[in-house]
Amino acid sequence: MTDTGFCHDFIDHFDEQARNLLFYGDTGVGKTFLTNCVARELLNTSHTVIYLTAFHLVDILQNNTFGNDDMDDSDENMFHYILDCDLLIIDDLGTELNNAFVTSQLFLCINERLLARKSTIISTNLSLDELQNEYSERIFSRLISNYEIMLILGDDIRIKKAISD
């Protein structure tokens, strides 16, 4: 099945079962584009979708745990929205500063969504080996056993576009 066919299947059967996708591949091959296409289609059918970069997700998780003076009610509720939305998209996993706290909070987020049968799409430039080395065995195990994993191959579209312009 092609990358776009895979995404169409995910969208067409979204309400039938919770599915999780992990897109990995080099920079600029279209992972974020694919996640945004899925998001647009699901938003058009009145599903709730939250798109966050991994860096922004970690920021929200830190604010939820430790709080800060700049937090308002919407920031406080964001953690609950992350867990409850129909589709959570975590873009560029591996770009955030990783430590024990981040790993534990990421595990909490992934695991709670799995238990609630809520769909998640994760994109990363890391290889599967790098994911395994960067994150805990518990996170990697859940990704491998509960996510449909797709390697996205191709040339860097942004570089090709810049060269042709």
Each language-model region and where it sits:
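Pre-Walker A (pre-P-loop) alpha-helix and adjacent loop at the N terminus of AAA/AAA+ ATPase modules
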Residues: 1-21
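Short glycine-rich substrate-engagement loop in P-loop NTPases that contacts/grips substrate
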Residues: 4-5, 18, 43, 47-84
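Conserved ATPase "switch" residues in P-loop NTPase domains
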Residues: 15, 43, 114
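Walker A/P-loop nucleotide-binding motif
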Residues: 17-35
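P-loop NTPase Walker A phosphate-binding motif
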Residues: 33-46
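Loop/turn-to-beta-strand initiation segments
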Residues: 47-48, 84-87, 116-122
